[in-house]
């Protein structure tokens, strides 16, 4: 057991410590720090305050417990507090057990005892997170680096949990620290916390062929309407809208766009949305009422008669025929009376607007013409009377022809006298006439009387068949009802007089129109071998490329519009459409105003070259419509409805001379527009 120390020397040893403690306390009170700094540095400052005592303590420890063997009470006198004593003394005994008593003079014992008061040896703090370890009275304090916490500085501080660590966008926590980053499309600013947009469009290759638009944090590659961006190819590729089923009927895709087509021949056109179809309806009312007491002579385009009568009499009988007649047609057959073509007969016809009589008696034929011009559209009464040796033709009761004849029209056969009478045609081919004539006659007959007898059979037939009836009121012109067409075989190539020079071509069209509907083909060329439409002029109620509803006249080669011109198609007035095409030139005019070209100069030359190639092969000229062609063959395939006269290459087209004409088209008469309601 260690010898006890006397009180006197111990008290003397504690006096300097007390004096230093009072001085240190005075200094600590004089220095005032902010709360945060005081918290961080309170423990280190306490450590420094005890530094003098620690040095003194180390000297006492050397004398009391290293050079000599000390008791717990003596150790308490060295440390002057229980915590450090409680920490020191058990370990002091461990040093004795390990190295022997102080009296063995083992250097390891001295080192072991001298290190026991420093609780930072060995360092209990986490090496990674600790800035310094501070020894305290029986304890220690770990001063943590920024970003670390906990008693041993081994706990990471999550700076991102408070106000996102001060980062504008993304905060990344990591052991002992953190860093800011930005979303895609942004880059970190020099302050390390805020973000600024990256202009991806500064790179010319960002979108390749497409237009680049910078966006906050991103960018977009833009294409024109009708195109979609391909990120793999970095290019704009056409969108096939037809695969999306946008059109009600026929869809045609084109680069950046598409067009819908409707069955024009079926009476349909594009509706307002340019995708669906609607009926083509009249926009101008025409006076198409018909008279049940009239007989239309032009119904049969073939020239065959509209009425055939056969009279049989027991006694010799003479022909008497009277009727009212109206026409604008200058040529055609009114009636035939007689036997077969090699026997006796007469034909009453019109030529150049005047009555003409062809007759054949006993194999001898004659032709005579006389009287006023009667194709003025007014009603007049015409009569044919067979006398003993004469034929008398009267107009409005005035005799215009009196012709001596040798024989009778009624011919005896098997005990009866026979007479064939046909109206609007002859019972044989017109080439067998005395003088050939176009038999087709757009004329109207009423109040007919044959052989002074009442003809109820014909009247009843006409009454129930509107196609045999005439319009109640007509004007000069040709009427297209919207249900058919006519066509001609015309040649548009011209060979110059100079031998050896190349042939040239020309297409000039003048159309006088008074439309009843806003859609329909006025004029067109058709190549039968290719089933193509080399040229067309038509009314249309929309602009195909602008997808805008507008009343227009369109001039096109095949499906490509060369020129467009606005027209007030539904005003009930007559308009003049003029078209001129030749090598290097294509013009369209409406009422003297030139239309707008829809193609470049190079495209025009290419289209005209296509037209010329077609003109060097057989083509047919169509009026009022097209044959059964694909709806994509031309901008318009619908039939025209309204009045129209056509002049082609300075020649007036006579529908009676067409190679074909729909029976509902009237060649030389047209109903007027109905007067506006009062």
Curated annotation (Swiss-Prot):
Keyword annotations from UniProtKB, A to Z: Calcium, Disulfide bond, EGF-like domain, Gamma-carboxyglutamic acid, Glycoprotein, Growth regulation, Host-virus interaction, Metal-binding, Phosphoprotein, Repeat, Secreted, Signal
A GO CC term attached to the entry: endoplasmic reticulum lumen
Effect of residue 487 to A: Decreases activation of AXL
Residue ranges annotated for the Laminin G-like domain, each copy included: 298-470, 477-670
Domain Gla: 53-94
Domain of life: Eukaryota
Native species: Homo sapiens (Human)
Name by which UniProt lists this protein: Growth arrest-specific protein 6
Signal is among the record's keywords: yes
Cystine bridges: 65-70, 120-133, 125-142, 144-153, 160-171, 167-180, 182-195, 201-212, 207-221, 223-236, 242-251, 247-260, 262-277, 283-570, 444-470, 643-670
Residues the record lists as binding Ca(2+): 329, 331, 440, 656
Residues with Phosphotyrosine modification: 640
Keyword hit for DNA-binding: no
């Amino acid at each position: 057991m260690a010898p006890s120390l006397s009180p006197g020397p111990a008290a003397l040893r504690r006096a300097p410590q007390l004096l230093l403690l009072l001085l240190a306390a005075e200094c600590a009170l004089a220095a005032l720090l902010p709360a945060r700094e005081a918290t961080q540095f309170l423990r280190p400052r306490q450590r420094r305050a005890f530094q003098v005592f620690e040095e003194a303590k180390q000297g006492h420890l050397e004398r009391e417990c290293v050079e000599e063997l000390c008791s717990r009470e003596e150790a308490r006198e060295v440390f002057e507090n229980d915590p450090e004593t409680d920490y020191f003394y058990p370990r002091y005994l461990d040093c004795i057990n390990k190295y022997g008593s102080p009296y063995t003079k083992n250097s390891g014992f001295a080192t072991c005892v001298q290190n026991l008061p420093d609780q930072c040896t060995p360092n209990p703090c986490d090496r990674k997170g600790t800035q310094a370890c501070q020894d305290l009275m029986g304890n220690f304090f770990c001063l943590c680096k920024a970003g670390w916490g906990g008693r041993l500085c081994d706990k990471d501080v999550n700076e991102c949990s408070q106000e996102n660590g001060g980062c504008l966008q993304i905060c990344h926590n990591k052991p002992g620290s953190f860093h800011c980053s930005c979303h895609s499309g942004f880059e970190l600013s020099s302050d390390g916390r805020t973000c600024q947009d990256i202009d991806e469009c500064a790179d010319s290759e960002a979108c390749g062929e497409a237009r680049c638009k910078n966006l906050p944090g991103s960018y977009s590659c833009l294409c024109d309407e009708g195109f979609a961006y391909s990120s793999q190819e970095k290019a704009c590729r056409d969108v096939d809208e037809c695969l999306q089923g946008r059109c009600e009927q026929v869809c045609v895709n084109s680069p950046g766009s598409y067009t819908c087509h409707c069955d024009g021949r079926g009476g349909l056109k594009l509706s307002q949305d340019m995708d669906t179809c609607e009926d083509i309806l009249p926009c101008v009312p025409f006076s198409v009422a018909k008279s049940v007491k009239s007989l239309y002579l032009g119904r049969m385009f073939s020239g065959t008669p509209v009425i055939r009568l056969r009279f049989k009499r027991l006694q010799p009988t003479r022909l008497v025929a009277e009727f009212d007649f109206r026409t604008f047609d200058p040529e055609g057959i009114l009636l035939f009376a007689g036997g077969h073509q090699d026997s006796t007969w007469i034909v009453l016809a019109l030529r150049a607007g005047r009555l003409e009589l062809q007759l054949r008696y006993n194999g001898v034929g004659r032709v005579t013409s006389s009287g006023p011009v009667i194709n003025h559209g007014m009603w007049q009464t015409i009569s044919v009377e067979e006398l003993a040796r004469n034929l008398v033709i009267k107009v409005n009761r005035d005799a215009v022809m009196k012709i001596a004849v040798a024989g009778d029209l009624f011919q005896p056969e098997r005990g009866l006298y026979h007479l064939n009478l046909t109206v609007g045609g002859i019972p044989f081919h017109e080439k067998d006439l005395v003088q050939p004539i176009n038999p087709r006659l757009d004329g109207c007959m009423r109040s007919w009387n044959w052989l002074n007898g009442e003809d109820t059979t014909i009247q009843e037939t006409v009454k129930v068949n509107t196609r045999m009836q005439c319009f109640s009121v007509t004007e000069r012109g040709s009427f297209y009802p919207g249900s058919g067409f006519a066509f001609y075989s015309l040649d548009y190539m011209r060979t110059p007089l100079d031998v050896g020079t190349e042939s040239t071509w020309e297409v000039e069209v003048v159309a006088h129109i008074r439309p009843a509907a806003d859609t329909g083909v006025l004029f067109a060329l058709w190549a039968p071998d290719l089933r193509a439409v080399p040229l067309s002029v038509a009314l249309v109620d929309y602009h195909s490329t602008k997808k805008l509803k507008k009343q227009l006249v369109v001039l096109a080669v095949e499906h490509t519009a060369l020129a467009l011109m606005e027209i007030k198609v539904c005003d009930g007035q007559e308009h003049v459409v003029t078209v001129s095409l030749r090598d290097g030139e294509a013009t369209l005019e409406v009422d003297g105003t030139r239309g707008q070209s829809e193609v470049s100069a190079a495209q025009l030359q290419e289209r005209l070259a296509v037209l010329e190639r077609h003109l060097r092969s057989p083509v047919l000229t169509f009026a009022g419509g097209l044959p059964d062609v694909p709806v994509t063959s031309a901008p318009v395939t619908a039939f025209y409805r309204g009045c129209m006269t056509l002049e082609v290459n300075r020649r007036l087209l006579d529908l009676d001379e067409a190679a074909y004409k729909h029976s509902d088209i009237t060649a030389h008469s047209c109903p007027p527009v109905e007067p506006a309601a009062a």
